[in-house]
Amino acid sequence: MIVEPKFRGFICTTSHPTGCKKNVENQIEYVKENGKIEGAKRVLVLGASTGYGLASAIVASEACDAEVLGVSFEREAKGKRTASAGWYNIESLKKFSEGEGKKFISVNGDAFSNEVKSEVIDLIKENMGKVDLVIYSLAAPKRKDPVSGEVYSSCLKTVGAPFTSKTLDFHTGEIQDITINPATEEEIEGTRKVMGGEDWMLWIEALKEADVLEKGVKTIAYSYIGPEVTYPIYREGTIGRAKNDLEKTAGEINKVLKSLDGEGYISVNKALVTQASSAIPIVSLYISILYKVMKEKGTHEGCIEQIYRMFKELYEGKLNLDSENRIRIDDLEMAEDVQKAIEEIWPQITSENVFELSDAEDFKKEFFKLFGFGLEGVDYSEDVDITTV
């Protein structure tokens, strides 16, 4: 069938298999052009199908020549309904890896569950022995507590007081005022349970207990801080509370891994167009301005550039750590001159000048690319088989 983008709010409900494959191929090509990294050899990526998780799986496989086990929870095609972009991404990476004689194992299931943890441990024992790097890059709206069975939901709200600011509807290019209401205590706790560090710790404990962690193992979870303009909705909101919990967990994981000479890190990454960030009010406008400023300065990076740089710094012993022992690959975003330029543009921006003062057009293009649309070298008028790549 011919696949076109269809939307429900900020969610694209269709994905293009050939476009997703091209997107993965472009990231692989970037890594190949930039050379090998002497690093991890057996890698577990939790949340491997999109964004920073997908980039981590690609860099591990292509730059480090590592065996990779990727866990994700994606939808296969059914009838005339396409598979999710993440499903096509994983299938594409699997095909490219197999074509190069590399080992890439994928598990499609709920990484929060005990069943998937057990399945992954068995697969590591059978195929890899032990892993020397665990990437934690899970993003989900809900999580079922594996002990109590209770289902928790995450939400995007402020903490304490409502917050009004401007945001971008990237479909129309309109700048609108938006008010975000504060979360209840229950919503704050729900978001922490879904997006905090609890499940990361459960994974590390389960892997250690099963004796599938190599001596000197490293584990990294991804976080974001950003500038003050986004604090009320992000860093000081429900998501920020969950990220604080995630960051606190890194210190606790260090204690768990001490006997293995292992290390747990948080990597604070750059703001990028992802399925998650496009739905966050205020952040979409900030990213549009950020992209314009960083491209003009020649410092813009996407997921693959960020993660390649992080792996290189990690394994060459050149990590840029802050006072809280967090890896900072958001350094170029948070550079004083970049943030000063954004602060100057922010109060001036309106629906009339948004395409002039920001990269709103590119935000939209990048969003479409997440689902395999708008990539060069893909004929979108062609009939495609939506069940495969």
Curated annotation (Swiss-Prot):
In its UniProt record, which GO terms are filed under biological process?
fatty acid biosynthetic process
Descriptive protein name: Trans-2-enoyl-CoA reductase [NADH]
Is the NAD keyword given for this protein? yes
The terms under GO molecular function for this entry are: enoyl-[acyl-carrier-protein] reductase (NADH) activity; NAD binding; trans-2-enoyl-CoA reductase (NADH) activity
Query: Which parts of the sequence bind substrate?
Result: 224
Check the record and name the NCBIfam families matching this protein: EnoyACPredFabV, PRK13656.1
Q: Record's InterPro entries?
A: Eno_Rdtase_FAD-bd_dom, Enoyl-CoA_Rdtase_cat_dom, FabV-like_NADH_b, NAD(P)-bd_dom_sf, Trans-2-enoyl-CoA_reductase
Binding-site list for NAD(+): 47-52, 73-74, 110-111, 138-139, 243, 272-274
Catalytic residues, chain numbering: 234 (proton donor)
Task: Cite the EC number.
Answer: 1.3.1.44
Q: What is the lineage of its organism?
A: Bacteria, Bacillati, Bacillota, Clostridia, Eubacteriales
The free-text function statement in the UniProt record for this protein reads: Involved in the fatty acid synthesis (FAS II). Catalyzes the reduction of a carbon-carbon double bond in an enoyl moiety that is covalently linked to a coenzyme A (CoA).
